Amino acid sequence: MRKSTLVALLSLAILAAFAQSKTVEQIRADYNALKTEVARLPQMKETGIMYCLIVDDNPQGATYPGIGHFRSKTHFYYDVAGDEPPVLRLAVESYESGTQRTDTEAMYDERGRASFVFVSQRTVEGQPVVEQRLYMEGDSALDFTLNKIGVAEGLRAQSQRDVWMKANRLVKQFLSVMGGGDE
């Protein structure tokens, strides 16, 4: 009896892990398809199915006191259908300050919630310092990696929250620019 219970529990655990990784795999596939779609937009011109809003802070590269070189450029890729409000699908931000560069990419579901967030912090010379990936389903984190290595649940809370906050800030920025900031 105990052996069959143990086998059943082990089977359920394996099934749950497989289902979760399948969801992560689906998010990866969706992200790759979306990036392919975005890459094709310039060739599609007015027949493209997405729009792109670009916010470029300090494009002339002026220096900030105490910081030095600073620039932030964000591309928001979104859909519009009829009279419905725009739906953000992907935000891509490059932020340079002093000798550091942070690139953030966030993919959103149809309800405006982040489903995948990638954050890469590098030095100006291009040397990677930290890469973080967060996979979400609704409000639940499915997986979080640091430099392509899974991070144990108990150790990832603050880093995972920081990555999620970047994606949340980007969607709020988009809604603010598009006139939907109170949602």
Model-based region annotation:
Residues 1-4:
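Positively charged n-region of N-terminal signal peptides that target proteins for export
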